[in-house]
Amino acid sequence: MSRYRGPRLKKIRRLGALPGLTRKTPKSGSNLKKKFNSGKKEQYRIRLQEKQKLRFHYGLTERQLLRYVHIAGKAKRSTGQVLLQLLEMRLDNILFRLGMASTIPGARQLVNHRHILVNGRIVNIPSFRCKPRDIITTKDNQRSKGLVQNYIASSDPGKLPKHLTIDTLEYKGLVNKILDRKWVGLKINELLVVEY
């Protein structure tokens, strides 16, 4: 199954706010959610929605998400927290959280087009797993800096998570440590995703 490229507002109406997918918001008063009242389907539907929220927010395919759940399951700590840490330490998500891109798909495009350096080396894999003390910069040409400049200027420094720092003048971000659960940018119950 390939990455979702369809209408984003449909997904937001169905699943709720997904800041990584788009900045758009549905019109208030649009009541398109249908309520189903059955026992087993209700529980299944809740778990499926939580999984879909995670998938669409981070821009993952079904196979990628299963691989991350498998890796998190092998860890000795809580599977749900490890899963969220793995997803939050992806390069495309870190660019989004630093404010260098407006959405995670936009950050993926920056990485794919070779505008981003990690520790002085070009990385063109959006799923690259960042580690603490990684330095993320743009290429030293005007085009790359111009792409990131508008997003950094419009981003809110108060929303920056504690595990990241950014130098807006040099277009440089630093990963300080691994993310805490309370700084995840998405309201989700990760245990339901693992149970699914």
Curated annotation (Swiss-Prot):
Report the GO molecular function annotations: rRNA binding; structural constituent of ribosome
Cell location: Plastid, Chloroplast
The Gene Ontology CC terms held by the record are: chloroplast; small ribosomal subunit
- In Swiss-Prot or TrEMBL terms, this protein is called Small ribosomal subunit protein uS4c
Please describe the quaternary structure of this protein: Part of the 30S ribosomal subunit. Contacts protein S5. The interaction surface between S4 and S5 is involved in control of translational fidelity.
* Role this protein plays: One of the primary rRNA binding proteins, it binds directly to 16S rRNA where it nucleates assembly of the body of the 30S subunit. With S5 and S12 plays an important role in translational accuracy.
Which GO BP annotation is one of this protein's?
translation
The record's comment on protein family reads: Belongs to the universal ribosomal protein uS4 family.
Q: Which SMART domains match?
A: Ribosomal_S4, S4
Its keywords, alphabetically, are:
Chloroplast, Plastid, Ribonucleoprotein, Ribosomal protein, RNA-binding, rRNA-binding
The organism named in the record is Elymus canadensis (Canada wild rye)
Query: PANTHER family of this UniProt entry?
Result: 30S 40S RIBOSOMAL PROTEIN, SMALL RIBOSOMAL SUBUNIT PROTEIN US4M
Q: Does the keyword Electron transport apply?
A: no
Pfam entry (one): S4
The family database entries (PROSITE patterns) matched by this protein are listed as: RIBOSOMAL_S4, S4
Residue span, S4 RNA-binding domain = 89-157
